C-alpha cells in the first residue's frame, strides 16, 4: 500500500481524478488513481457471449474451419505470379502475409478499403521478420469463423482489379 501512495499516475482520464484546476489535478487515493477512463463494461459482458459461442461451436471446429479458409486463400493467392507470400501454410492458420511486386502495401490497402476490404499493412511490430526478408513491410490478411470462401473470392477479384489500377 505504501508503494501505491508513492507512485504517480502514468496516464490521465475520467474516474481517477478528485479535482481539476487550470494548473493542477488532484487524484483519487490508492489504486483508484491508476484506473483512468471508463471500464470496459461492454467487453466484459460480451466476453460471456464469446465463451458461449466457442463452447457451442467447438474450438476444434473453429480451428478446422479457419484452417480450411486459410488453405483456400493460400491456393488462390498462389495463382498470382507477381506475389511473394511470407507464410508457410503448413505452419500457419488464419493469417497470410504478402507483397505484390511493384505495388506498395499501403497503396494496396487504400484501394482495397474502397471495396470494403480491410487488411493490415506495415511492419506489424515484427521488424526482425521484415529485416530477414529485406522489406520495410507487407500486407496481411486474416480471417476467422465469420468469414466465408465467398469473402476470399471477393478479395481475389478485388486484388486483380486493384493490380490493374496500380500497375
Label each residue range with its predicted role.
Residues 1-167:
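Pyridoxal 5′-phosphate
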